[in-house]
Regions:
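Canonical Rossmann dinucleotide-binding motif of NAD(H)/NADP(H)-dependent dehydrogenases/reductases
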Residues: 2-34
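Catalytic Tyr-X3-Lys loop
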Residues: 84, 101-120, 135, 139, ...
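Substrate-binding pocket helix/loop in short-chain dehydrogenase/reductase
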Residues: 96-100, 104-109, 194, 201, ...
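Short C-terminal tail/terminal secondary-structure segment
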Residues: 97, 148, 225, 236-249
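Active-site helix of classical SDR
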Residues: 123, 159, 167
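Alpha-helical segment proximal to the catalytic Tyr-Lys
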Residues: 128, 172-176
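Residue(s) in the substrate-gating loop at a strand-loop-helix junction
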Residues: 143
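Short, small/polar-rich loop/turn modules that mediate ligand/substrate recognition or access, typified
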Residues: 175, 180, 235-237
Length: 249
């Protein structure tokens, strides 16, 4: 299946984890991939690994929270061809396991700047390149924390709730444009970072999930691929659940 033949996809935070899994899935189905990551060396390594498999991939270094860098990145990518898919997977956890009264304002603002402002800027400049073509797919990676809130993670929860708000607003604003914007709100996904956690910590997280397991990278990549495909033509402004039944709304 080559659903994305002759399409260019930009994946932020695409050097590792969820972002890379989505990048690889889209590449497998014919997309030319741009890995956009703050760490240029890591983004190039990810692009190289895709090229090694015979896929079309390039890399670019940019901080999603810096408007000048985001604009420059999209300007460069646009010169290479029309960009019809953008997935924003860049983000940080921020203060974790800390009561709100002990959270430093600078840490709160940094988390929101990367997760929330970054999502806004990526959506803004993705729209600028997609609207003239009257077609595009934007996907923002949110979190179950944005729907339910996680104790001890006020900055992350607030920033991801904001991402869901962006999707709702922008989806309605551009509903007739041919450009859709949606989000995925995952619970715990089995990434290399999660694999390194203590078993009891993983059990604590999976106990909240009715399926009693972590999500798999290929599962979120498969869902993401459908959301950014032409098949998903009547969905916009929506946040898709990826929580094994934890959130059913």
């Amino acid at each position: 299946m080559n659903r994305f033949e002759n399409q260019t996809a930009v994946i932020t935070g695409g050097a590792t984890g969820i972002g890379f899994a989505i990048a690889e899935k889209l590449a497998e189905e014919g997309a030319k991939i741009w890995i956009l990551d703050r760490d240029k060396a890591s983004s190039e390594m990810a692009a190289q690994s895709l090229r090694y498999k015979g896929y079309k991939a390039d890399s670019i270094g940019a901080d999603v929270s810096d408007e000048t860098e985001v604009k420059a990145a999209f300007d460069k990518i646009s010169k290479d061809g029309d960009c019809s898919i953008v997935v924003n997977s860049a983000g940080i956890v921020g203060p974790n396991g800390i009561n709100t009264t002990e959270v430093d304002l600078a840490d709160f603002e940094k988390t929101c700047r990367i997760n929330l402002t970054g999502s806004f800027l990526i959506a803004k400049y993705a729209l600028k390149v997609m609207l003239p073509n009257k077609y595009g797919r934007i996907l923002l990676i949110a979190s179950i924390a944005g729907k339910e809130g996680n104790a001890g993670m006020v900055a992350y929860s607030a920033s991801k709730a904001g991402v869901i708000g962006i999707v709702k607003s922008v989806g309605k604003e551009y509903a007739e444009s041919g450009v859709t914007i949606n989000a995925v709100a995952p619970a715990t996904i089995m990434t290399s970072m999660v694999e390194k956690m203590e078993p009891q910590q993983i059990k604590y997280m999976t106990d909240k999930i009715p399926m009693k397991r972590c999500g798999k990278l290929e599962e979120i990549a498969n869902l993401a691929a459908w959301i950014v495909s032409k098949e998903a033509s009547f969905n916009t402004g929506f946040t898709f659940d990826m929580t094994g039944g934890r959130a059913v709304y």
